[in-house]
Amino acid sequence: MLKQIRPAIVMIVFFTVLTGLVYPLGMTGIAQALFPRQANGSLIEKDGKVIGSELIGQAFASDKYFHGRPSAAGNGYDAGASGGSNLGPTNPKLIERIKGGAEKLKAENPNQPVPMDLVTTSGSGLDPQISPEAAYFQVPRVAKARGIDEAKVKALVDGQVEGRELGFMGEPVVNVLALNLALDAAK
């Protein structure tokens, strides 16, 4: 019987070592060698201190900053609680949350339609980007809070718009953290 079980045990140990150690360590080594910034989380540093990642959204509450999408991930962009709200399109809680968010934003900028991504969460709840329309919608509030010309703020948004991936996939987006850092740098 041991003769029959031995090949199975050898294969289990072999593939456990291959897929559990060799492959992950090999891929980590290749990623660190070829793409070190991305392999380490695409972290953004300011004055030698990590302030965020290009890949994870952050909550910005001040009117002096652009705000990202609402987060369904725990208590405000908690990466450990990543996930959608799982509320269906007819769920009263979802409808009420969207209406409340839209009313608040409409009061802030009554002459513009509220972009959907400013009132709806993403699948992960952690998206770092918003649409250019959502960024332009916030320009008057940010310019007023900072006491600077709207045209200057709009130009900063224009400079932060990232086009479609490979020229045809997805939609143009604006990374909120990068935009807010550019805003701070422009003063």
UniProtKB/Swiss-Prot annotation:
State the name under which the record lists this protein: Potassium-transporting ATPase KdpC subunit
Native source organism of the sequence? Mesorhizobium japonicum (strain LMG 29417 / CECT 9101 / MAFF 303099)
Bilayer topology reads: Single-pass membrane protein
Does the record's keyword annotation contain Glycosyltransferase? no
What GO cellular component entries does it have?
plasma membrane
Give the gene name. Answer: kdpC
Family per similarity comment: Belongs to the KdpC family.
Instruction: Return one GO MF term.
Output: P-type potassium transmembrane transporter activity
**Transmembrane segment boundaries:** 7-27
NCBIfam families, per this entry?
Answer: kdpC, PRK00315.1
Quaternary structure, per UniProt, is: The system is composed of three essential subunits: KdpA, KdpB and KdpC.
Query: What keywords are assigned to this protein?
Result: ATP-binding, Cell inner membrane, Cell membrane, Ion transport, Membrane, Nucleotide-binding, Potassium, Potassium transport, Transmembrane, Transmembrane helix, Transport
Query: What functional role does this protein have?
Result: Part of the high-affinity ATP-driven potassium transport (or Kdp) system, which catalyzes the hydrolysis of ATP coupled with the electrogenic transport of potassium into the cytoplasm. This subunit acts as a catalytic chaperone that increases the ATP-binding affinity of the ATP-hydrolyzing subunit KdpB by the formation of a transient KdpB/KdpC/ATP ternary complex.
Superkingdom of this protein's organism: Bacteria
The places in or outside the cell where this protein is found are:
Cell inner membrane
